[in-house]
Amino acid sequence: MTDFCSIDGRLTPLGEGLPGGVYLYQRLRTVDYRPLHTAAHLSRLRDGAGSLFGRPAELPAGRIADEIGALLRANGYPAGGATVTLRLYADGTYALTADGVSLYRTYALRSLRPAAAVVPCDGYRPEWPTSARREMAR
């Protein structure tokens, strides 16, 4: 399956490459194909572009949100949590790349893990000593 990126709103095979040059970026979390806190992310990019590139960027939040949804669907991402990187280049070009599916639907502490599936099984050699048997014998 081809991975896609979005450059200035156009879906493009990722293999064709992203624009080169200096850029600012924000990584956005998404839930069900919609980015979270889009306005805050775009505000940071606008401020950074004004400071570093000498001109603020015009990135409409609604259009960016729609493009993120289209990008995730084009890449075959399931509904749920995912991460997307928005790059803003010095010339005003922007690019979106899908970075991966998340186990979590929203923000979560990285030290938290989903509940593990536990499958009971016997050891290869039941007569061999194990730490569990030693503890049970005490």
Question: Which residue ranges define each predicted feature?
Answer:
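Helix-start/capping segments and mature chain N-termini
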Residues: 1-74, 81-83, 89-138
